[in-house]
Amino acid sequence: MANIEKDHQKVILVGDGAVGSSYAYALTLQGIAQEVGIVDIFKEKTQGDAIDLSDALAFTSPKKIYAAEYSDAKDADVVVITAGAPQKPGETRLDLVSKNLKILKTIVDPIVESGFNGIFLVAANPVDILTYATWKLSGFPKERVIGSGTSLDSARFRKDIAEMVNVDARSVHAYIMGEHGDTEFPVWSHANIGGIKISEWVKAHPEVKEEELVKIFESVRDAAYTIINLKGATFYGIGTALARITKAILDDENAVLPLSVFMDGQYGLNDIFIGSPAVINRSGITNILEIPLTDHEMESMHKSAKQLKDIVTKAFEELDIETRQ
């Protein structure tokens, strides 16, 4: 793969909509990467955003930001795909499958043809299916194709638990797993606050009823619908989540993050990308942490996987998409 050097790290962003521009802004504010190229069919928008973001550099750190072409991906370390049809009010992420698969093929093919040899990071929805499709279309090793997965869902989960117990969200350790969507599920069995299991915390606080925990998860699961109904789209949260994942890659962190990753026997699943905690560094995914799930959680994982697999199989058959693997 591309040699990621500390003194020059390059990201190509494909998709300059609300999510893409929020991600580029997060990279700029946090000083992540030294070169960011933005690709979109609306070239004037990418040119405008490149100038606008560059105006912030005197307040952050040096960075080359520009309107790019697919050919610029040839020496990039990471290509981030946010392009796709947006989720409309009342529409599920899975409703987007056919149209976004068609869009994805027009993106992956020219990037691969450019000679790109880095890591694909996919955020377009439905992210688990489009990450799988990126892997199939690119012919890349599974370790170097990653989806944002349940990273945002897990962040929402931690935030809501933190608000319930009045602690910093960074001190809450909890995961949402499965599909980034309606069949996702909370891993309550391993959730903890500063090392104290949620189950133990609830025992010590009888005023907290089980119904409150159920409401927390439902709020997390339905958060996108709530935000979309209020303002039309979600972008700040996922933009920041993507910046965090990018930093873990470029800085070779070996960070554990909940991502959409390829299952090769883990949790009894195969040939599917789905949300699970995994170790990520400059080589991509180095290890999938197979958390010991309860019977109910494992059942939820398999239910989520079945739905994803059924949809992706049907979509590939109907669209007759040619793949590289």
From Swiss-Prot:
A Pfam match: Ldh_1_N
Top EC category: oxidoreductase
Residues found modified as Phosphotyrosine: Y225
Keyword Oxidoreductase: yes
UniProt keyword list: Allosteric enzyme, Cytoplasm, NAD, Oxidoreductase, Phosphoprotein
Residue sites binding beta-D-fructose 1,6-bisphosphate per the record: R158, H173
GO biological process, alphabetically ordered: glycolytic process; lactate metabolic process
Entry-linked InterPro entries: L-lactate/malate_DH, L-lactate_DH, L-lactate_DH_AS, Lactate/malate_DH_C, Lactate/malate_DH_N, Lactate_DH/Glyco_Ohase_4_C, NAD(P)-bd_dom_sf
EC code: 1.1.1.27
Compartments, record wording: Cytoplasm
Pathway, per record: Fermentation; pyruvate fermentation to lactate; (S)-lactate from pyruvate: step 1/1
CDD domains found in the cross-reference section: HicDH_like
Regulation of its function: Allosterically activated by fructose 1,6-bisphosphate (FBP).
GO cellular component, one term: cytoplasm
Record-listed substrate binding positions: Q87, R93, N125, P126, V127, D128, D153, S154, A155, R156, T234
Entry's Gene Ontology molecular function annotations: L-lactate dehydrogenase activity
Chemical reaction(s) catalysed: (S)-lactate + NAD(+) = pyruvate + NADH + H(+)
Predominant location: cytoplasm
SUPFAM superfamilies reported in the protein's UniProt record: LDH C-terminal domain-like, NAD(P)-binding Rossmann-fold domains
Annotated catalytic residues: H180 (proton acceptor)
Residues bound to NAD(+): V19, D40, K45, Y70, G84, A85, T106, A123, A124, N125, S148
Family: Belongs to the LDH/MDH superfamily. LDH family.
PANTHER family the UniProt entry points to: L-2-HYDROXYCARBOXYLATE DEHYDROGENASE (NAD(P)(+)), L-LACTATE DEHYDROGENASE
Subunit description: Homotetramer.
Protein task: Catalyzes the conversion of lactate to pyruvate.
Protein's name in the database: L-lactate dehydrogenase
Species for this entry: Latilactobacillus sakei subsp. sakei (strain 23K)
Lineage: Bacteria, Bacillati, Bacillota, Bacilli, Lactobacillales
